[in-house]
Amino acid sequence: MGKFQKGFFVGATTAAHQVEGNNIYSDCWAQEQLKYSIFQEPSLDAVDHYNRYQEDIEYMADAGLNAYRFSIEWARIEPEQGKFVETEIEHYRNVIRCCREKGLEPFVTLHHFSSPLWVIQKGGWESEDVIQYFAEYVEYVMKKLGNEIKYVCTINEANMGLQISSIMERQKRQEKANASRRKEEGQQVQLGMDSEKMEENERLGAEENERVFYTATPQTFCSSRTEQGDFIVMKAHQKAVHIIKELYPETKTGLTLSLHDIQPQPGGEERAKAEWEKEFTHYLPYIEQDKFLGVQNYSRSRIGADGIVPVPEHAELTQMNYEYYPEALEHVIRAVSKQFHGDLYVTENGIATADDTRRIAFIEKATDGVASCIADDIPVKGYFYWSLLDNFEWHRGYTMTFGLIQVDRKNGMKRQVKPSLAYLGQLCPDK
């Protein structure tokens, strides 16, 4: 008997801006072109998944995966306010149908960090207007594609802006106290965020931002978020869920959250409790009616009396400079399940490494933890590895290799499947 039973989803995840290429109407694309850009390099063609999705889906199917989580790019669907592009809807319809033809269940994310440039020019994610903008986009997509989708994530990592805000606040406190400029553990998890560069470019690029975004401080989804902005994101989620329920009541809908394995050290118990409250617990009133929650975890965060404790000496680090700690996933699932009682999906979990044997070991240990949770009757229904492809890792560009498939961007985007894809596939109970 395998690790998981029939009906459990084993898949991989991508995000449109990171893999498709030429997302020219998005805020991220605009930021990449700035003189004082927060991005190490521009995304350009990314890994051309937009034109090669059939090939990439075929690789997943051949490996034995039974699900694929991907995002629909809002900036492609609605490049100008109120002007929806039918050909782009048809593109995503083709992606969905390709998944089904190859035996993969499509899990569709409606917003994965990038937004249309016009949304940011109109106030972005700190403006209440974005709730209605997002709702109109969601309604359009669901009316067109909803009959072909069973699982929808409204917003990816809805808590990311608040996490970035916390990072910025900690950094400022360190500077004020003449502290070391050493990167804090967990600071760059997933987004590849360089908070120092973000702050510097906000200062230097104000005039450029005024020209491009109509404001000196554009409020993208991945900007440092205020509590009011956090509330706006959650109201946008709730309105989207309402729309989807009205159109397709049987569709399973939820969002995803970025969650650290927060471990209190002696004297840090109250701080750790406050961190978990900010990162997870305060979202419960907004998601308690959702049919599932997407859990996204990459490592742990140890909290002492004075805040985050450095990574243990001699600990293995990933390319992202955080601790290799696959056990974190099980700990997070168990913590979440005590407070959220719906279905859980691991919608992202993985590492950036050039050593695929370490990736395989990571997947093995992490999925052992998932299986242990299921054995204790925690309703975990799927595991999605981040990411399918070595891709554009936001501020860090193409230097971080998370993928199950290598992409040679200098040689015609040639794909090379890594052994880790086959390893993940053999975990699928349907194989």
Where in the sequence are the language-model features?
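Non-catalytic scaffold segments within catalytic domains of secreted glycoside hydrolases
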Residues: 1-52, 57, 61-66, 77-431
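Active-site gating/metal-coordination segments in enzymes
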Residues: 69-74
